[in-house]
Structure formats: C-alpha cells, structure tokens
UniProtKB/Swiss-Prot annotation:
GO terms for biological process: mRNA processing; RNA splicing; tRNA processing. It comes from Sisymbrium irio (London rocket). One of its GO terms (cellular component) is chloroplast. This is Maturase K. Keywords: Chloroplast, mRNA processing, Plastid, RNA-binding, tRNA processing. One of its GO terms (molecular function) is RNA binding. Usually encoded in the trnK tRNA gene intron. Probably assists in splicing its own and other chloroplast group II introns. The gene is matK. InterPro entries: Domain_X, Maturase_MatK, Maturase_MatK_N.
Length: 502
C-alpha cells in the first residue's frame, strides 16, 4: 500500500474525497495485479484466471474493462451473457472490479494510519500477532473473573448496511454509488460470504467484514466509556453516531425477576473484550443481573442500529467455575487447586487450607476426532483407518503430509494443561500413516513395520518434544512435569487446516 501513495498525483486532502477516478487508471490495475501475484495463499491473479490469456494480454483486458465502465449501458448486461469476441463474461469483469475495490478503498485507511504514527517511534512486535499471545494474558486475568459473555457476531442481512458502514469512512459519493451499483447488479447474496463460491475477491470480503465489525465495536466502546454518565433510573439508548445525544430511537426495558428494570449499564473497570473468528467474549466480575443487562444490550444494539435479527440464544453467559468456554480451539475453564500449608508459631503448629485458581485449557478431543473422521483419517469412534486418496502419492510425500499435520496440531495444542488427548491425536495420525503406506504396498501393518523398523515413526517426534526432553531429565518426576508443562508459541499467526498442507 506504500507503493500506492507514490502513484497518486493529488494531495492527501483530496485522496479521501476523490477515489472514483482511480477506477479508470490503468496503473491501479497493475498495482492490484502485482499484489494478486504476491498473495500468501498462492491463488492465481484474477487477471490471469482464464488459461487462454497470457500475461501480455492483461493490459488489453484492463482497457476493455475501462471502456465498459465508461459505457455503463454495456456494463448492465445479465451475467449469463457471454461476449464471444472478447472471451469474458461480465462476471469475470466484476471480479476484476472487486480486486480494484480491495486496493482502492484501503487507501484512505492506510493514509490515516500512517499519519497517526508520524512522530512516534514504535517498534514492530510480531509476537503480538500470534494467536497464542492472548493465552498468557487470559491466564493472568481470567482467574479474577467469574462470568464470560460469549457473543456470535452476526452478518448484515442487507447490502445497503455495508454501503452505509463504508459511508462513515469513505467520503467519495461517486465511488460509493459505483460500489452500490456493482453489489446490487452482480452480487449473489447466497454465496456472498462463501470464499469458495463467492464472486467477490477474498481480500475485499475481508475488508467489508472488518469494516462492519469496526463500526459495531466503535459504537460499543463509545457507549462503554460513557456508561457511567448515564442515569440508571431513566436510561434511554442513543444509537446514532451523528448527533449522538440529540436522537432518541428506542426506549428499552428489561423485565428481570418479575420486576421492571431499566437497562442501565454500570461502569466496570475489570471488563475485558476479545474478538476472534466471528465471535467475541466479554469477561467480567459482574453479577448475573448485570451480565443479563449486557446480553440484552448486545441484542438491541444489533437489532436497532444494524437492522439485524439477532436472537438472544446467540449470546451465552458462561460461569467459568462450572462451564467450559470454547475459545480458539481450546476448552477453557477455571480450575481450583487446593493447597495445604503447614504454619508454626512458637510451639503451636496448624494447617492452612488455601485454594489457587488457575486457567485450565483442554483439547476438545470430540470435535477434533470428528474433524479427523470427516477427512477420513479415522472413524467416528477414533479408530485409525488408511487414507485411500493418498495411496497414489510417493512414500516420502505421504510421510511428509502426515508429519506436517501432526506437527501443526502438536505445535498449536502445546498449551494444553493435559497432554493425554494430544497423545491420542498423535497416535491416530501415526497409525493412519502406517496403514496408508501398508495399503499402498499391499501389505499388513505388522509386516510393513517389521520390514522398515521403528525409524519410520521417529519422524513424528516434534521439535518441542525434542527440546522439552533435553530440558527435563528422564525420571518419573520429570515425566510428570513434562506431562503438565504448557508451552505457548508466538509464531502462530493463523489456524492451520488439518488437511491443507500446502
């Protein structure tokens, strides 16, 4: 995005107001094309999606698209219509436009972010980007909480909501009208958020979703900071961002325990908010009454402001001492560790019972076995079976696939408090690998292992197992300590798919 600023020919004040002319500049398409080739997911660029076209024809495709946008009557053609002379459907051209949107609409955000960092010496810390970086924070904070609000963030049900969300940040009316026109003209709503079937660019989908969530969080944090200034006896909810205290839309009442209670929010300094994978959690030390108020606050926020039918069942109140919280692939809960301390004062000695509260992170073995069974690594009971679809590959390729999957799982779930379930998953993958190789060579598992020896299974020894085995000596006490130790890695930036080993 820093390269995009060099191409722009007007100052920063005009960049945020005039984005629409950029759709008719060929160098912007070249910029999007270069970024499409350098994406981490290794997908092919949309400009070379058609196998009949070589790289030298990409500029010709761009010129044809710009001519179609100048002549809007030619752009409004049913997506099923095919221009045989050009060899492309309008659907293909709209995919190119979505790539352009993904680049152009990020320009005002990147400029605003760069201006906010001017004059500040900030060090880049890639450790904070890791998924595992949140777990040490939870271990330190969750022991002081008793309730967690688990909220499923809903998607907008109407395209106009997305346009209105962008209206607060993109001031160019022409680009917004063009954006609205393309969405209503070509977008298939059923496949809008499906990355495999959607006609939109995945990067643009991610930008739309982040804008939608950013709008929700800005309102939530705004009300959260000012909740202590609102009266608890007659509380009226203001949802509009413009003239916030001047517009009254809804007057809410919540009936709890057969008594009418006005929905008033009390300021809680021990409130922590975490968002992940389309969900968010709200951890606090409030009472059940206040947690119910927060629950109905979220329901009314989505229904009144975003016009989304949001059911109260999508907001769960979990008590950490009793319920398990499904968080980033772990089952987290609070565990009470009783401790007995002997104290002696002068000639008298007595025992002191103490209880320590620790965060217990467990592996959801049932869901993982279900995922392995769905991908044909085992059956629904967890018994390993051969991977029939991989028997056409070479032995080294099969072994590398299983080793990579096993190491990814072991790497991510190294923070579990008990390793028994992790060892079971490793056992399933190891035996599945042996059965797959034995099936390929038309042999039994016992005969195959006898012929190759135990060196085959040593490939599954992960790097963290080797390091921990060097730190702790081989003894009964050390093995128990190794069984309980938790390791959080700060290099995990995304959740690896079990089968996606590319």
């Amino acid at each position: 995005m820093x390269x995009x600023x060099g191409y722009l020919e007007f100052d920063g004040a005009r960049q945020q107001s005039f984005l629409y002319p950029l759709f008719f500049r060929e160098y912007i398409y070249v910029l999007a094309y270069d970024q499409g080739l350098n994406r981490l997911n290794r997908n092919r660029s949309i400009f070379l999606e058609n196998a009949d076209y070589d790289k030298k024809y990409s500029s010709l495709i761009v010129k044809r698209l710009i001519l179609r946008m100048y002549e809007q009557n030619r752009l409004i053609i049913p997506t099923k219509g095919l221009n045989k002379n050009l060899g492309h459907t309008n659907l293909f051209y709209y995919q190119m436009i979505s790539v352009l949107f993904a680049v152009i609409v990020e320009i005002p955000f990147s400029l605003r972010l760069g201006s906010s960092f001017e004059g500040k010496k900030l060090k880049k810390s890639y450790n904070l980007q890791s998924i595992h970086s949140i777990f040490p924070f939870l271990e330190d904070k969750f022991s002081h909480f008793n309730y967690v609000l688990d909220v499923l963030i809903p998607y907008p049900i109407h395209l106009e909501i997305l346009v209105q969300t962008l209206r607060y940040r993109v001031k160019d009316a022409s680009s917004l009208h063009f954006f609205r026109f393309c969405l209503y003209e070509y977008c298939n709503w059923k496949n809008f958020y499906s990355k495999k079937k959607s006609i939109l660019n995945p990067r643009f989908l991610l930008f739309l979703y982040n804008s939608h969530v950013c709008e929700y969080e800005s309102i939530f944090f705004f009300l959260r900071k000012r909740s202590s200034h609102l009266r608890s006896t007659s509380y009226e909810v203001f949802f509009e961002r413009i003239l916030f205290y001047g517009k009254i839309q809804h007057f809410l009442k919540v009936f709890i325990n057969n008594f009418p209670a006005i929905l008033g929010l009390l300021k809680d300094p021990f409130l922590h908010y975490v968002r992940y994978h389309g969900k968010c959690i709200l951890a606090t030390k409030d009472t059940p009454l206040l947690m119910n108020k927060w629950k109905y606050y979220f329901v009314n926020l989505w229904q009144c402001y975003f016009s989304v039918w949001f059911q109260s069942q999508k907001v769960n109140i979990n008590k950490l001492s009793k319920d398990n919280l499904e968080f980033l692939g772990y089952l987290s809960s609070l565990r009470l560790n009783p401790l007995v301390v002997r104290s002696q004062m002068l000639e008298n000695s007595f025992l002191i019972d103490n209880v320590r509260i620790k965060l217990d992170s467990k592996i959801p073995i049932s869901s993982i076995i279900g995922s392995l069974a769905k991908d044909k690594f085992c059956n629904v009971l967890g018994h390993p079976i051969s991977k029939a679809t991989w028997t056409d590959s070479s032995d080294s390729d099969i072994l590398n696939r299983f080793v990579r999957i096993c190491r990814n799982i072991s790497h991510y779930y190294s923070g579990s408090s008990k390793k028994k379930n992790l060892y079971r998953i490793k056992y399933i993958l190891r035996l599945c690998c042996v059965k797959t190789l034995a099936r390929k060579h038309k042999s039994t598992v016992r005969a195959f292992l006898k012929r190759l020896g135990s060196g085959l299974l040593e490939e599954f020894l992960t790097g963290e197992d080797q390091v921990l085995s060097l730190i702790f000596q081989r003894s009964d006490y050390a093995s128990k300590r190794l069984y309980r130790v938790r390791v959080w890695y700060l290099d995990i930036l995304y959740l690896n798919d079990l089968v996606n080993h590319e």
